[in-house]
């Protein structure tokens, strides 16, 4: 299992975001640590083993429902890929018998006072902290653009005449075009070369 999983991760490395690759890798590492060996065959990963692992995630590691769900889903994805590539038969897929809790997550957002405090925070000119703050603020003021999309943005994505960004959004795979406000424009102008 682990040999296949590592090879599969290397194959998809260039087709997924870095954060997805890291998440998958860390979940495989965590499962390998739980198993205590790299020599695990697909048929050894049973419903009982997965339920024990799920209990270990929650009870021993203190992982919440969302993290437990991610851990099991990553393993299931590796199984599905192995089935698709005819490495194992469909009958070996134990995940359909596993129950995963879905808990509603509370997403926390900064309020206007917190955003203003961050924007007005005195930082040393020319240091990386200032650039990271500007990137974060740009993500807020550019219509909530995901930080990962901000990082890979290029100046060519910006239409200066119309104050619009035309960007391929990594998560959805779609191209979005949207107008940005003065704060975002000022940040772009600050770094224009």
Predicted regions and their residues:
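Basic/aromatic-enriched alpha-helical hairpins
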Residues: 1-61
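Conserved hydrophobic/aromatic "anchor" residues
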Residues: 53, 78-79, 191
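Conserved helix-loop functional segments at active or binding sites
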Residues: 56-59, 84, 117-124, 156, ...
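N-terminal DNA-binding recognition helix of tyrosine site-specific recombinases/integrases
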Residues: 30, 34, 40-48, 59-94, ...
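Glycine- and acidic
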Residues: 55-64, 165-170
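Basic, Lys/Arg- and aromatic-enriched nucleic-acid-binding interface segment
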Residues: 65, 69, 90-147, 151
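Conserved tyrosine-mediated DNA breakage-rejoining catalytic core shared by Y-recombinases
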Residues: 96-97, 152-192
